[in-house]
Amino acid sequence: MRIIAGKYKRRKLFTPKGIQTRPSTDRLRETLMAILEGGRFGFPLNSNLIIDVFAGTGALGIEAASRGHPNKVIFIEKNSNAVKIIEENIKITKSNELFEILNIDLSQITTWKFEKAGLVFLDPPYFSDLVEKALIKLKEIDAILPDAIIVAEVSIREKNKFIKNFRILFSKKLGKS
């Protein structure tokens, strides 16, 4: 797995051994970034703050930072082994000051000490019902801008849930996602 484009292009990302995480494939990230860079939804890769929840390897947040110009990317990941992988992947960017890792379950965050995010990636374990819970929590702690773009990766067998104050702008099937 590698960074596909931008200032960190071709840098190899570390991935965990075993199946505790399900890293987003290069194909999925490339398609997703093309959609986000296309202008149809503004230019969310240039948001001041990008949040990558259920961050796993950090690939989505790092790819977004590679292509855009955020002031900060925050990874939220409760698994300590995954956090170690994210730390290694941040080191390869040589831009440590751009990234921050919160080693905590999103549901445990009670206050948000950062500015509001314009782009959020949600990539929870499949069939966990965590997308809806994460959206509610992010809104509750006031972590997202009213017009933030939320990108959620779910299994094609999971139903899209329409959540109050959120609407689906775009949906695309890629492999099993």
Language-model regions, residue ranges each:
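Class I S-adenosyl-L-methionine-dependent methyltransferase catalytic core
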Residues: 1-177
